[in-house]
Amino acid sequence: RFGVALMGLGIARRSFLEAAIWAHHREAKGRLLVDLPLVREQLVDRLVDLEAAFALGFECAAAAHRSDGERLRRILVPAAKVRLCRLGVEVSGFTVDLFGGNGYCEDWGLTRLLRDAVCHPIWEGSENICALDVLRAIRREHAHEAVLARVDEALAVAAEAPGYLTEATEAVRSHRDRLAAKVAELDIIDADWTHAGAERLTELLLRTVQGALLCEQGATAPHKALVALRYSRRRLMPERAWDDRIAFTAGRDLIAFAEFDPVRAEQAAAT
């Protein structure tokens, strides 16, 4: 299952690379696609989702070396399978759309990426099966306790981050508390209602964990701090997305995986 999740992640990364290269060479309305504000926003958001997905995938792998790793992997692997495989479909579809007719025809190979990506959410457990597996890990093995502890650990590291990242860490902490509350409610609601909310619970867990991991990374790398801030504004507090200017002011360098000095990162983080 983890291997299939990484297949989805690999297709997402390859598709993003194709999209980024195309955007730096293809012109429309006399400008490169990457310089069109809407396209740059879309590329940065795909990049941020990719960074969050890589953080989650690497966490699943690293869990093998932790004392609580068995419970972490038990709950994070099915959750990662949902997110990473779906991301492969989303990013490959976006890339086909960005290429237009060239993306749809067979000459460029993008449709092959999309066809393969569509297989992965089904392979080794559909999204519904994986969501129910997350629920099972919570109910039977209390695996959420390991997740909450890992989130707390990441937030402790992020506490040493630059001040402009505080907005993101507070959003993650709020989601962490909400996740704990929703898990506690499982003991007082009936089985059918619990199953009905499995997808929502998995999504809440994913956003919380990915946000925490990005904040942890952002404590030591300014460009990662911008990624964490963009992720929190888009995925954890979407009302802030309307004012976010990270893609507008620093999107080109983020797409190119350029390094940022702390001063420039703080300027880009301002809304």
Please name every model-derived segment.
Residues 1-271:
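Flavin-dependent oxidoreductase catalytic core characteristic
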